[in-house]
Amino acid sequence: MNQRNADQPAGHTALLVLVILIGLNLRPFLTAIGPLAQAIDQRLALGMDTLAWLTLLPLWLIGIGVLLTPSLRRRTSARQLLGLALLLLGIGSAMRFDAQSGALLIASAALCGLGSALVQGVLPALIKQHFARKVPLVMGIFSACMMGGGALGASLTPRLVASLDWSRALALWSLPVLLALVWLVWQVRLPRAAAVAILHGEQRLITLPRSWLLIVCFGIINSGYGIVVAWLAPAYMANGWSAAQAGELVAWLALAQTASGLGLPLLAARSLDRRRWMGLAIAMQLAGFGGLWLAPASAPILWCMLCGAGLGGSFSLIMVIALDHLPDPRRAGTLSALMQGFGFMLAATGPWVAAWLYHLFGDFAAAWQWQLGGLLLMSLLVLRLDPRHYPRVMGLPTASKPTLSAHLSTSAAAQSNTPA
């Protein structure tokens, strides 16, 4: 396979398969922890504050790592960065094989978080570059696979514990990472252009109010994800549910994330104005978190699926919306990296705040209320995401301003084409 293959149909197919394989590996290391919280605590005597670090630290490191990725892209190729990311994910998961201390478990979470950071800093720009007419579709596939992997982590790991030690069960998630690494090495070639220096002036993106609006929205979405991944299973296990039953709840949430993460971007692809679909995603989260707060025992699967559908749809949509703001793939990728970097650092506070509220009030109701407050703020911010104003708010030169009709035709093409 030569260097031009990433621009040919076969190269597109290989890259799309890589997107799927990588996406499936980005969340099991997080979602597998919650259902095993009691077993981990029994062996290692970790309190809730320490358990929170298994979610908080990876999210924070994902934020730091994504911010560093644009600088790394100037020094090395996207293919090398993805290879390093998969190595970090694999080593981090394998380290859990004989976890005898909380420090080792936290170190493994840190490595996995850094690997996830590199992926999420590199892939959005690659997707916009190689699938320019199918960005909503391919971003939806990536997000859906990421959330589907989370569902597998939450549902399969407690079942594996029936015949394996919990640390061995966690370490098994290094095997699918190895499969993705083998596919990258043997089948995927990316042109050096994917890693060329970014254009002058991108450093000013961080000074734009629009960048910070996207950061806050992204942070609120992923704060909700961090809270449910860390504490949904323990909340129900505190009421007598088994680890397997609580893991099934997280799996239902992640399955709804998967469907919505793929479906909502496809529904939104017919128009550059994606606000009504984001509004639907926020409404589902409000209903889901409201149910967890007011009537957690009445319909837990429904509440979890509403939360999952809202989280999955809003995550995919905000990723697409960030890429919509700028026509150049490299600048759009840098904006996405800024949004994810600072957004994940903001999101990392969610699990910690939830643990603090639990200590303060004795249950998780206040954690769900906290997320509801964030969603109300986000619903106001989303109103400002009018695509007619993207060129102005991003400070594009007059000659570079994209027309709405051009964007709409590109989005419509995403609907009329199947993935390469």
Predicted regions and their residues:
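Extracytoplasmic gate region of multi-pass secondary transporters
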Residues: I33-G34, P209-A251, L255-G261
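Helix-breaking motifs and short loop linkers at transmembrane-helix boundaries and internal kinks
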Residues: A45, S77, D98-A103, A132, ...
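Conserved MFS/SLC helix-loop-helix module at the cytosolic interface between two early adjacent transmembrane helices
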Residues: I64-A103
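Helix-to-loop junctions at the C-terminal end of transmembrane segments
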Residues: G65-S77, S260-D273
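Cytoplasmic helix-loop-helix junction between adjacent transmembrane helices
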Residues: S108-A144
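Intracellular juxtamembrane helix-capping segments at the cytosolic ends
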Residues: L118-F131, G313-P327
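Helix-loop-helix hairpin linking two adjacent transmembrane segments in secondary transporters
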Residues: R133-K134, G140-R189
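A late C-terminal transmembrane helix in Major Facilitator Superfamily
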Residues: P329-F364, Q371
